[in-house]
């Protein structure tokens, strides 16, 4: 996953200043911990998949376990999804390699948990006795779809500064972050795994059951948006890196729709419900 320094720096700055980081970080500094740890966990997984030692994976796992059990749960799911998808596209159906790397990754991951168990174990016991773990909070709608107004705010909130913080769905990405979606094609398939990962996490974001699972099956919440934002930053890097592969017809359609929506957004005073 080596990238040119211009695209890498652009992705790093975008990830650091995405709106969710500013929104959540102001509310509580704990929300910044997973924002920092997740890219390092993915880098640690990448090293294990390439046959290197997983020291970085173990150390960052230990740090994230020390910091906050709640976010450690989300980080574990997101990191596992990254590892499975990356392996699938790196090694295909080589199951012998899968079990070898899986056991190797589990070793370094469990070693990291061992480093953090001094603090993690008491927190787990305290968390198990918390009132928040008493059961699933009822959801007014079906578990497989939000109300229509939520989707209106969510789609517009992808690129426009809309306070669509229902269930912590704070997005507001720069329009250039979607460049990577237009660079995929028959001649450029080495990053298809990123498109698959983006699709899976988008599905998790768009249905209440995904928010429930990512929040420990307690109630619907998408505080894991830091992981989704990391994928958006990677899409930006990929789009800049492969700008010559961008398919211009869908890109022009996207640009036209963006300017139309921007005009309507400004005309309606920034309200997606009008």
Where are these regions (language model features)?
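Membrane-embedded helix bundles of polyisoprenyl
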Residues: 1, 5-89, 104-124, 129, ...
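Membrane-interface helix-boundary motifs at transmembrane edges
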Residues: 1-4, 47-52, 90-100, 183-192, ...
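Juxtamembrane loop-helix boundary motifs flanking transmembrane segments in multi-pass membrane proteins
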Residues: 5, 9, 17, 54-55, ...
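Transmembrane alpha-helices and membrane-interface helical segments
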Residues: 39-47, 79-87, 179-183, 228-246
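Contiguous transmembrane helix-bundle modules in multi-pass membrane proteins
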Residues: 52, 71, 193-206, 215, ...
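Periplasmic/ER-lumenal interhelical loops and adjacent helix-loop junctions
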Residues: 100-194, 200-222, 226, 266-273
């Amino acid at each position: 996953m080596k990238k040119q320094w211009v695209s890498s720096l652009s992705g790093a700055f975008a990830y650091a200043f995405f709106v969710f980081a500013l929104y959540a970080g102001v509310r509580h500094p704990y929300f910044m911990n997973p924002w920092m740890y997740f890219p390092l966990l993915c880098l640690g997984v990448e090293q294990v998949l390439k046959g290197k030692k997983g020291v970085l994976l173990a150390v960052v796992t230990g740090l994230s376990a020390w910091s906050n059990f709640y976010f450690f749960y989300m980080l574990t799911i997101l990191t596992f999804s990254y590892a499975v998808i990356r392996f699938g596209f790196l090694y295909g159906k080589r199951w012998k390699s899968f079990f070898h790397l899986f056991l190797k990754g589990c070793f370094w991951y469990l070693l990291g948990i061992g480093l953090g168990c001094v603090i993690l174990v008491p927190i787990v016991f305290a968390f198990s006795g918390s009132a928040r773990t008493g059961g699933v909070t009822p959801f007014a709608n079906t578990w497989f779809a939000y109300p229509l107004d939520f989707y209106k705010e969510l789609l517009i909130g992808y690129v426009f500064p809309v306070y669509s913080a229902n269930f912590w769905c704070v997005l507001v990405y720069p329009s250039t972050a979607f460049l990577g979606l237009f660079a995929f094609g028959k001649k450029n398939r080495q990053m298809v795994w990123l498109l698959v990962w983006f699709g899976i996490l988008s599905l998790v974001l768009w249905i209440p059951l995904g928010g429930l699972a990512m929040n420990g099956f307690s109630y619907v919440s998408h505080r894991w948006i830091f992981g989704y934002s990391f994928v958006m930053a990677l899409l930006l890097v990929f789009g800049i890196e492969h700008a010559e592969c961008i398919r211009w017809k869908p890109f022009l359609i996207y640009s036209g729709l963006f300017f139309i929506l921007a005009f309507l957004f400004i005309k309606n005073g920034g309200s997606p419900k009008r």
